[in-house]
Amino acid sequence: MSDVKPPQHFTMNGNPPPPEFKNPKKPGRLTNHLQYIEKVVIRALWKHHFSWPFRQPVDAVRLNLPDYYTIIKNPMDLTTIRKRLENNYYWKAMECVEDFNTMFTNCYVYNRPGDDIVLMAQVLEKLFLEKVAEMPEEEYEISALTTKGPVKGARKSTIGLKKRPPSPMSEVVFQQTVTVIPPDALHTIPSAPLSAQLTAKLKNGVKRKADTTTPSASSIPSCESSSCVTEPKVLKLFSRRGSGRPIKPPCKDLPESPPQHQVGRRTKLSERLKYCNAILKEMFSKKHSAYAWPFYKPVDAETLGLLDYHEIIHQPMDMSTIKKKMEAREYTDALQFAADMRLMFSNCYKYNPPGHEVVSMARKLQDVFEFRFSKIPDEPKNANPVSSHNRVKKERARSPSSSESSDSESSSPENSSDTEEEDEEERAHRLASLEEQQLKAVREQLQLLTQTPLSKILKRSSSSKSSGCKVCTMMNSLKKPKFNSVLRRKESRACDSEEEMNTLPMSYEEKRQLSLDINKLPGDKLGKVVNIIKAREPLLRDTDPEEIEIDFETLKPSTLRALECYVVGCLRKKKNKPPKKSKIKEKDKDLQHATGEQNSHKKTKIETDGEIKDTTHPSRLSDSSSSSSSSDSSSSDSSSSDSCDSDSGLTEQKTKRKQSKGPGHANKIKKKKYYPVVPLPEQALRQANAEVKDSSSASGVMCQSRPSSLVSETGSKDLFASQHAKHPVEDITAITGIPPLLSPLTSPSAAMPATGSQSTSSSQFEASSPLCLYKDIVLKHADSWTSLGKLATQTPCTIKSSKESFQQFRKVAMEKELTTASRGLVSKHCLTQQPQKAKLECQPSKPEVESAELPLMAAILDTPKAPEPSSVLQNSVDREREMARKREQERRRREAMSGVIDMTMQRDIMATFEKNLE
């Protein structure tokens, strides 16, 4: 329900007449309190934006509130109170205050606690109580020009009150002021009950809304301050409304009068005190008045009925007293000002319970003060604070009124001065102890700040020492003595002690070398460099890591030394890692080639001895085949071995890698003593003619040397698997070189010399033709063998397994075919040139995919070389027919096998591509 009171004429049906505001039978008068309520309180409430529901009486008919006047027996509104004040309806101010309380109580009784109208009433009531607290302490009648005439008997009862000047306002602060009362004021005893009744009424109003959420008058009896309006403003108001001329009160009634004589002798405030004065002005501003008003004035314990206040609080303090001391230049340091402010808050916390409203207000105000005071500028070094002894003397020389205001329990001037001296000495001692504590805290913080970087530097130096020593021991085992001396110099420079790092500056050459070394670092190491610089340089801690610029001239020597130690360690690790990898690669390659060599020895053991194999195997390789085999190995090892050679600087490793690029790379470790240089093609031919007994063994050796130097690891595994076949044609398959079946497709020219070898009648041509074959292949199609090495390294194990299964299937088929073919083949000496010409004529017309398999079929057709020359002789016609039949059969077989091989390779290539995409 709302309590809205729109403007209305009091002639409506259903609404009772408004309360009376003029009663001739009831005597009334005009007092200073009533005048203050009319001119200050009513105006303030009327201007408030929440006052519109309370300006007129409640229109129950319009608002559809039929039970309003049944519940509310005594309605009241601001218009009625205003008219009563204008017509001198009230005899004293307490009657008007009761009307205000009735208006607010009616709102609380009729409406629910959470309604908007209730919250508006609470805000207005708080404003009303603040204004009433600023009202003068004693009430007396004044002559009003607007009134028709004084009421009978009023002059007799207010003769003494008329001559009385306005007394100081009732103030709720920490410090009680002793006011000098003139002799004629002793007859004004009836004014004291009025103050007591006003206080009691305020307390009653507080109890009524103690459960509300907004601050109320409950804070007044135990609060630490009261008003925002200063005393000169009220005096000016009284002089303006009383008579036509201002009233000058006696100087003895104004406690501010003694310090006024010192205005001409004021000294200039320091920067810190100016900042404190600004803080004080801000706390007096309207911005903080909602929770700072209880601390504006000293606590009036007698008026508020706080009889035990001065028994608990021995040193009261308030913001007005602090302001007076600031204006009187009694503060020589900002710490004294802060001590008084904190004393004021501590008194509030000490006297009031923790859950009291004024305690929460004090906490809010103290938070504001501490936040502002923490930003106070630093004190200059040449500023010397005044000694506490001189400060105590200055405090003693103050006016009697200010000394009396600091001691509320004194009954005589002597006791007051003694207590004040003790308080000042205690305060000076407390300030000295606070200064010592602050200095001690600052000292501890400085020690922590200085010790933390040192501990971090020591940890980094110890870690760099250990890592540097490990790197040094590893490098000593690899480098030459001359290089070791350079390493020792760098290591001694990197492992210097912390004292040397801090004191030893870095020369220009060292800075230039450090800059070059930092540029050599990889990208992942540069982040650590930035972290080292930020940890040691306070000015660079807030910079962006992506846009940081390093100037070595501005960095500290310790930072440069730490960077040097870190960079040297990183570069050493970078140099040590590549040789290890190259060694491992070389060992793996040696083992692989040695295994392939042993397998080749086992396969060819039937034809020749092991010793002859070891001595003739490398010598039968031509210079062209060595260049073809080196093309694959050099392409795969150039990226790693070249970089390692340039970094390590070891001549032994360079020579080893150069030798590894030759044709005997597979068995260079075992046979380096006997064959340091690869023989020329002519020497290979001589050794072949001298040691090999027949052409079949020579061709078998050549076919075997080819896969050992050109085919990858897959070919060696297939060779090893093929030697276990228990078939009579085992020697033939080993000699003809089955592993080339897994080699990539080659050009048609690769098979032409091999086919021609069948029709040769001399063994010399048979021995020399394979050499020419390999020479032509190397010179014309070296790129195909390079792609073979790349393909072998890229294919996964799944492709190898599929090749192995296909190889086994092919081997069985080939063995079966060769067994049937060997029965009807004739010797090589009786072959004519006609089949050779026919073969050469039909080969260029075949497609490229079909001709790519000619080397494989050539190896199959070389099988007649395996049987002994003393085979069964047949007629020439039968031989020609058999050869023609064989050609046609092989052609058809080639066509079928070429399609199968293409499909398999295509499938394997697609599978590899999909895996790489994943």
Swiss-Prot record:
Pfam families: BET, BRD4_CDT, Bromodomain
Protein name in UniProt: Bromodomain testis-specific protein
Keywords, in A-Z order: Activator, Bromodomain, Chromatin regulator, Coiled coil, Differentiation, Meiosis, Nucleus, Repeat, Spermatogenesis, Transcription, Transcription regulation
Signal peptide residues on this chain, from the entry's feature table: none
Basic residues biased stretches: 575-584
Transmembrane spans: none
Source superkingdom: Eukaryota
Source organism per UniProt: Danio rerio (Zebrafish)
Site residues (Histone H4K5ac binding), renumbered to this chain: N111, D116
Motif stretch (Nuclear localization signal): 204-215
